[in-house]
Regions:
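Acidic, serine/threonine-rich low-complexity disordered tracts
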Residues: 2-102, 140-229
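Surface-exposed beta-loop interaction hotspot
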Residues: 92-149
């Protein structure tokens, strides 16, 4: 991601919009923003899904990362119809804590968050954060522990994840054709057949992803991208 490249050059703000698809049909969008602050990198966004998606919903999120792309906090407000869930996650050094509030119920979690562990959430920005820490060549792969956060409770599920770089090419983007790499993401407990694939540019921005491994079934597509100075 170009907000804080390894060279140390810092863009004050990066923002974009993803179109979201279900079974090949448009079903919503995600707008996001990354800004630099004294706190670190502040990531904010809103994702909304509408029919024909089978579960129309809206998520608003705010994440905090260090300048080394380590997630240290994530706040989520998830709305489905009249129901609303609030999830608050934060890292305390090598411990990850979560508090889930839904109606009159509260659930808390606590577990290990070692330095080599990653966090995955429903936005493709977290794919970019994972890529930003690694140098992938064609055929290269990296396996690591990951804390997966997502529906139905926005709680944590620990897993092991594998990223593989499987293809080089040129991909259309809001900025024109760009050199890009295609990655396959899978959980080691399930195998690659249950994974998914996406294209990302040289700055690790996800350009387009797919439902599973089939490139004829788009999942999310970057349709707007802008960078501040």
């Amino acid at each position: 991601m170009p907000a804080s490249p390894p060279s140390g050059e810092l863009a004050t703000e990066v923002a974009g919009r993803y179109a979201i698809f279900f079974n090949g049909q448009p079903c919503g969008e995600e707008r996001w923003r990354i800004a630099s602050s004294a706190e670190g990198l502040i990531v904010t966004g809103e994702q909304e899904m509408v029919p024909p998606h089978p579960f129309p919903n809206r998520q608003a999120y705010r994440a905090v990362l260090t300048r080394e792309w380590r997630a240290t906090g994530l706040e989520i407000q998830w709305t489905v119809g009249e129901r609303r869930l609030v999830a608050t996650h934060h890292a305390d050094l090598t411990t990850w804590r979560a508090r889930i509030e839904y109606q009159d119920h509260v659930k808390e979690q606590e577990g290990d968050y070692p330095n080599y562990c990653e966090v995955e959430y429903v936005t493709h920005l977290f794919n970019s954060f994972i890529l930003a820490k690694r140098d992938f060549q064609l055929g290269g792969e990296h396996e690591f522990p990951v804390l997966r956060i997502g529906p139905p409770y926005m709680a944590v599920t620990p897993e092991r994840m594998l990223y593989r770089c499987v293809e080089l090419g040129t991909w259309a983007s809001p900025l024109g054709p760009l050199p890009a790499k295609r990655y396959v993401v899978s959980l080691t407990s399930r195998g690659e057949d249950e994974g998914y694939t996406f294209w990302a540019d040289e700055h690790d921005v996800v350009l387009e992803s797919y439902e599973g491994l089939d490139p004829s079934r788009p999942w999310m597509r970057l349709v707007e991208y802008r960078r501040g100075t």
